């Protein structure tokens, strides 16, 4: 076990993350690298010359691997940018259909069905509640959407994302139609990453929502009756924060560097930041690319199928382990039973042992197979 000096100090890194200019983070990482360098030199010095030569060869191979990986990341970024450009016309078509600016022509057989009995609704354009339904069908997002939120999310026209180059990260954009809840037409959420290839979040920033009076969904009004005999007969009103999807645009705030926070609060803050990033990455990686599949529920069924497969594999492994344990228990019971029935004599070890094994196998049965 390494000593405390050489071990990675999470609190140091957390403290460093509080500094917006990242100077503290750089120092923390430098200290960590220095510790690692010291450990590495100790390991190398303890090697024999022949082993040291082999390790040096392995390090050369690792360097070649790192060069290829850097090239892979560079080419991947170019490829991703290329396909993001190719996706855009498809997203535009999706937007037009969802919001009714483009009408899809019915196939002849579908048109006949409408003429035979179904009424055409002139007012209904596009696909109502498209994004609301897509968001609610995802397990991660649905936990954030309350019944009060649904009225506002019905006005959601589109969701887009784009990369941020400086600082590295990505931005989500939520486009809303004119609605009775807030004045904003676009709500944004930006994630600034310390390392784009690793999910190491520096901070998140969201749009301040300009709510109409009495329409704020992130707060609720509590009314309390005045005490008996009080001169003030009017109910006492109080605003209280409440759960809402729109809290997503007010991400957790990291305390100032000089502010002391206890371990429990720091852990709660870390959990909130991880949850917030999970929501953002889910919208970016799952909802936006496959919105119609989430709307229809097909994406949800596909995820459930994958989860079921994983659970079935876990069950099979557990049952295999249980079967092995049952076999071991049966063997132990048979051995104890045989010893009780007849003990081998010292003068006839071979014959005695053979007899015990034979008696043990007479009543032995294979363990039941719980699942084929």
UniProtKB/Swiss-Prot annotation:
The UniProt entry, under Pfam families, shows: NAP (PF00956)
Task: Report the principal subcellular site.
Answer: nucleus
Mutagenesis / variant outcome for changing residue 369 to S: Abolishes farnesylation and disrupts the function of the protein
Identify residues that carry Phosphoserine. Answer: 41
Subcellular location, record wording: Nucleus; Cytoplasm
Q: What are the GO BP annotations of this UniProt entry?
A: cell differentiation; cell population proliferation; DNA repair; double-strand break repair via homologous recombination; nucleosome assembly; somatic cell DNA recombination
Any other noteworthy remark? Answer: Triple mutant nap1;1-nap1;2-nap1;3 has no obvious visible phenotype but exhibits hypersensitivity to DNA damage after UV-radiation, affected transcription of NER related genes, slight hypersensitive response to abscisic acid (ABA) in seedling growth and impaired somatic homologous recombination.
Q: What is this protein called?
A: Nucleosome assembly protein 1;1
Record the organism: Arabidopsis thaliana (Mouse-ear cress)
């Amino acid at each position: 076990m390494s000593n405390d000096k050489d071990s990675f100090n999470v609190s140091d890194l957390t403290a460093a993350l509080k500094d917006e200019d990242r100077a503290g983070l750089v120092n923390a990482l430098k200290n960590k690298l220095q510790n690692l360098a010291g450990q590495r030199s100790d390991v190398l010095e303890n090697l024999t010359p022949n082993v040291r030569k082999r390790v040096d060869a392995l390090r050369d191979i690792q360097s070649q691997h790192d060069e290829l990986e850097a090239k892979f990341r560079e080419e991947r970024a170019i490829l991703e940018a290329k396909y993001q450009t190719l996706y855009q016309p498809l997203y535009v078509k999706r937007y037009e259909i969802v919001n009714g600016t483009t009408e899809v022509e019915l196939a002849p057989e579908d048109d006949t069905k409408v003429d035979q009995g179904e009424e055409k609704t002139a007012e209904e354009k596009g696909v109502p509640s498209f994004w609301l339904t897509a968001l609610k069908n995802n397990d991660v997002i649905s936990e954030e959407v309350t019944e009060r939120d649904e009225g506002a999310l019905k006005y959601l026209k589109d969701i887009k994302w784009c990369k941020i180059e400086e600082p590295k990260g990505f931005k989500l954009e939520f486009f809303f139609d004119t609605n009775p809840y807030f004045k904003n037409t676009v709500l944004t959420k930006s994630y600034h990453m310390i390392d784009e290839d690793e999910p190491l979040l520096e901070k998140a920033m969201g749009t301040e929502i300009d709510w109409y009076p009495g329409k704020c969904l992130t707060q609720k009004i509590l009314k309390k009756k005045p005490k008996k005999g009080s001169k003030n007969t009017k109910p006492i009103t109080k605003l209280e924060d409440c759960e809402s999807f729109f809290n997503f645009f007010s991400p957790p705030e990291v305390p100032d560097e000089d502010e002391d926070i206890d371990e429990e609060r720091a852990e709660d803050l870390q959990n909130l930041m991880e949850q917030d990033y999970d929501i953002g990455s889910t919208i970016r990686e799952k909802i936006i690319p496959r919105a119609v599949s989430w709307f229809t529920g097909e994406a949800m069924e596909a995820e459930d199928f994958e989860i079921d497969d994983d659970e079935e594999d876990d069950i099979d492994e557990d049952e295999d382990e249980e079967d092995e344990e049952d076999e071991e228990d049966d063997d132990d019971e048979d051995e104890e039973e045989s010893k009780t029935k007849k003990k081998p004599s010292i003068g006839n070890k071979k014959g005695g042992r053979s007899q015990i094994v034979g008696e043990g196998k007479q009543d032995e049965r294979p363990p039941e197979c719980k699942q084929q």
